[in-house]
């Protein structure tokens, strides 16, 4: 979702068209497929086509939280310094897969570890790689937000797709 970025986008770009899309996780199978839904691949293909026809400059935002750990997220113990360290190591390992600009490898790595730290928005992150096909990806910043009692930690980062 882009609700946190929306005021910034409107401030920077003014009254421009904004299209938001909710992309499902590639790690979770659809409960039932009636054949009436557009697949992620179909969506990406059509969006590329439409944007190509329209022309101009497109600014993409893929908003995602990374890890969600601690008792608030169903883990048995609170978040201590060791857990923070382990989460950052895991996050940076998964981010390195993303920075390789291979959506399938990124999803495969997340599937292999069963999304152990409960990342959100793996779908939109991998879809963005397929949509944009950047020449490079730069990790700009990485942060962890942990409540004072260690009940919950959520990590996030900012990246630039060049």
Please describe what each predicted stretch is.
Residues 1-57, 69-162:
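Flexible, D/E/H-enriched segments
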Residues 60-62:
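Residue-level marker for buried hydrophobic side chains located in beta-strands
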């Amino acid at each position: 979702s882009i609700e946190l970025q929306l005021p910034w986008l409107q401030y920077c770009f003014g009254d421009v068209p904004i299209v938001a899309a909710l992309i499902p996780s590639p790690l979770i199978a659809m409960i039932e497929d009636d054949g009436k839904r557009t697949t992620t691949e179909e969506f990406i293909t059509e969006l590329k086509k439409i944007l190509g026809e329209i022309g101009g400059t497109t600014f993409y935002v893929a908003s995602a939280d990374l890890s969600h750990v601690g008792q608030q997220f169903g883990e048995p113990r609170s978040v201590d310094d060791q857990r923070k360290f382990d989460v950052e190591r895991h996050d940076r390992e998964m981010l390195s897969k993303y920075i390789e600009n291979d959506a399938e490898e990124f999803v495969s790595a997340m599937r292999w570890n069963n999304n152990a730290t409960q990342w959100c928005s793996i779908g939109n992150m991998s879809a963005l790689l397929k949509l944009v096909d950047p020449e490079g990806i730069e990790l700009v910043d990485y942060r962890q937000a942990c409540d004072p009692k260690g009940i919950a930690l959520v990590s996030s980062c900012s990246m630039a797709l060049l």
